[in-house]
Amino acid sequence: MAAKEVKFGDSARKKMLVGVNVLADAVKATLGPKGRNVVLEKSFGAPTITKDGVSVAKEIELKDRFENMGAQLVKDVASKANDEAGDGTTTATVLAQAIVNEGLKAVAAGMNPMDLKRGIDKATIAIVAELKQLAKPCTDSKAIAQVGTISANSDESIGQIIAEAMERVGKEGVITVEEGSGFENELSVVEGMQFDRGYLSPYFINKPDTMVAELDNPLLLLVDKKISNIRELLPVLEGVAKAGRPLLIVAEDVEGEALATLVVNNMRGIVKVAAVKAPGFGDRRKAMLQDIAILTGGTVISEEVGLSLETATLEHLGNAKRVVLNKENTTIIDGAGAQADIEARVAQIRKQIEDTTSDYDKEKLQERLAKLAGGVAVIKVGAGTEVEMKEKKARVEDALHATRAAVEEGVVPGGGVALVRALQAISELKGDNEDQNVGIALLRRAVEAPLRQIVANAGGEPSVVVDKVKQGSGNYGFNAASDTYGDMIEMGILDPAKVTRSALQAAASIGGLMVTTEAMVAEVVEDKPAPAMPDMGGMGGMGGMM
């Protein structure tokens, strides 16, 4: 095991503070409408230019191991805020830096670190409760566009396209961000339920010009097994032929004789039919088949529930207005399932999302939720160069997270004003002793840091602006983009309450832990001498090269 170096007390805290400040100073340069860019070196290819706080934080590793520990802890603040709300990483970093700097000053002055932390925690709880009181619901498209615009560093086109996407697919719909091929941002929406399985045979195509199979007012047979014997299907096919409606078969697989017979029947026009594999694998396949059944008002034919193909009737089949199949995807439009059943299924999936700890499972469950509840929108980001494309895509993703957070917990006045207004919650707050009161006062100063930094980045005088904002009330604040004062909400400067809340909670959590640090342990880096050149042994046979 490698030897370790241990630092204690002030010498440990000083080293940690250096790391905190290096990382935070790089990140906070990006805050606000007049925030600057940061250029990140890449091991190959062009450097990346970004105004995204978490991207800057992730790149920073310091040579000194003790300083690096401080930097990594602040990086954790940014990641925590990003994981919970998807945005607010720069605000969280600025808050953490302010808490740590103020806190370590108090520790150096002889305050008890544990009581300081208790004071910080008390004040944080009070401010979070006040932020919830200040939050206004965010329901209309205009407010959603404004939140998106602010989060995308004042790019109105991004705010607008996100608001349009949310309007089209609903608040629960899935919105994905992809790299486009043009200069402009584009939005495409898939309505209905789409899953990534295409037709099993090109002979099902009935629209050769677009290479799709389209079924109008079809019945849907959902089967949880492979179908290879046509005899099993005959009772259902006869019933469907009598009803004179097309049929879509969704099964684990349709193969051999069964598939051949379906193709022949389809080509002869006896039964208009198409077959597709069920989406997903294993348990997820069963769950997705059940989703389709609920959406279309059908029943999954499964031996687990005592149903077999031979006994299936038309009552077991689902209904939809239209189904479109291409080579890769199947889209079911306007399923005939009961609204109450769909809502119950949505609530069930939502509960599973809350309970799961795996990010992959969460993503898949959210996709299922969107397919049932709304639809899927794809934002294709357009840009002039590859470097700009990457930077813009990161901003669109940030803005998307921010708008989702705004819909979830409402909006508060932006530009650091909400935190200043929430200070009233701790104006009378008292701790159990004087050291806790210092912790509360410390947070009172720290929550002004985001507003001060926004003003500093815009070239203003932070103290003057903070005083003027404090003299106002309600939504009154400073618009750094136009250097004017006024009602932040009327000026369209909004922050999601969830983003502000999670930024403060993450900063107070890590800040409190750093203030109470007493020792740091790191590996000793030994300078290994460079290996000597091997003896070439005279290199016989090379005498004539002089």
Swiss-Prot record:
Entry-linked CDD domains: GroEL
A single GO BP: protein refolding
Pfam families: Cpn60_TCP1
EC number from the UniProt entry: 5.6.1.7
PROSITE patterns, A to Z: CHAPERONINS_CPN60
Compartments where located: Cytoplasm
Binding site for ATP: 30-33, 51, 87-91, 415, 479-481, 495
Assembly and oligomerization: Forms a cylinder of 14 subunits composed of two heptameric rings stacked back-to-back. Interacts with the co-chaperonin GroES.
Name of the encoding gene: groEL
Spans through the membrane: none
Entry GO terms, CC: cytoplasm
Keywords of this entry: ATP-binding, Chaperone, Cytoplasm, Isomerase, Nucleotide-binding
Name of the molecule in the record: Chaperonin GroEL
Organism: Stutzerimonas stutzeri (strain A1501) (Pseudomonas stutzeri)
Main location: cytoplasm
GO MF term (any one): ATP binding
InterPro entries (UniProt xref): Chaperonin_Cpn60_CS, Cpn60/GroEL, Cpn60/GroEL/TCP-1, GroEL-like_apical_dom_sf, GROEL-like_equatorial_sf, TCP-1-like_intermed_sf
Catalytic reactions on record: ATP + H2O + a folded polypeptide = ADP + phosphate + an unfolded polypeptide
Functional description taken from the UniProt entry: Together with its co-chaperonin GroES, plays an essential role in assisting protein folding. The GroEL-GroES system forms a nano-cage that allows encapsulation of the non-native substrate proteins and provides a physical environment optimized to promote and accelerate protein folding.
Family according to the record: Belongs to the chaperonin (HSP60) family.
